[in-house]
Amino acid sequence: MERGSAIVIGAGVGGLATAIGLRRAGWAVRVLERRTELERYGTAFGLHPTAQDALDRLGLGAAVGARAVPYRGARIRRPDGTVLAALPLERIERRAGRPEILVSRPRLMDVLLAEVDRCGVSVEYGTAFGGPDGTGADLVVGADGINSAVRTGAFGERSAPREVGTVAWIGIAGFETGVYGETWGRGRFFGMTPVEPGRTNWYATVPEATGAEELRESFAGWHDPIPRILAETDPSTWIRYRMRHLYPALPAFVHGGRTALVGDAAHAMTPNLGQGACTALLDAEALARAVAAHGRGALPAALAAYDAERRRSAQWVALGSRTLHRFVTARRPALRDGLVRLLPA
């Protein structure tokens, strides 16, 4: 079967995983990254069993699993610590035969970069995307995030980043809390997960941009260990960003028979379901598999197969995450909490 060449725009999780999958299929691959170096902030990615299956098919499952921790025993709580419900992690584990896992972003990126290097894929840093026509590649993959230049070139401004009206903070505490899950208040919430021994991943969402001291005050009366996390971690290591998603949903993840989008470039979502990295990995593996099955001579058919497999699924996840965000940040917490209590144990 005739093999071809691909250029991947963006060296994030989705872009590197796509490059690995295409290279393992025998394609010549280059990765362009506009930044001069990759950021190494230490937030955690949750990986659902389906995403772990995709990593297995890419030959990366064991390496990632060795750097991850299982996620179990998480609860949804009120600010006073009252448990409202359990997250369905154990149910997912029983059905899938493996637990959801959490891995720090730097550790996941280290695995991907090591495999990219081993496969002989070049990553060209400080290189902006100038459009598909001058690349000389058979396939152009847009993995360049929510502000994707590849997406804009293919679809114009019909879908664009849209703010949801809240601000997120994320960070890593230098101790294990032993208390995991999310705590929901009025218009705001706080989450904690394991990430690696001796550390805890945390994230918070508030209605407006605030400084570090204001954030601490926002959660000062909440149950332990939330105030301690904010008091004992260095604000200079915290990351703040306005929560956005891609709206409206794209009509396709592919364009013109030679361009495909993966990850946030295709379906950027709010982080409430913790599926951003998962969907990017599923996109990457599905695209590489479709291209390998059809070959260079049937690239339009390969992209159509990829779009058929991934678009509806990923867009449903994005919609679910946005809907959950509205529910969690509700201004009527009593009604919301009452509904949560009705969830099965």
Predicted feature residues:
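Conserved N-terminal helical subregion
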Residues: 2-6, 48-155, 159-172, 209-218
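N-terminal Rossmann-fold NAD(P) dinucleotide-binding loop
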Residues: 15-16
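Residue-level marker for buried hydrophobic side chains located in beta-strands
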Residues: 29-30, 140, 259-262
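Flavin-dependent oxidoreductases
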Residues: 164-193
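Glycine-rich FAD pyrophosphate-binding loop
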Residues: 23-43
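FAD/FMN-dependent oxidoreductases across multiple families
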Residues: 186-188, 196, 206-273, 279
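C-terminal helical "tail/cap" subdomain of flavin- and related membrane-associated enzymes
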Residues: 1-4, 81, 228, 251, ...
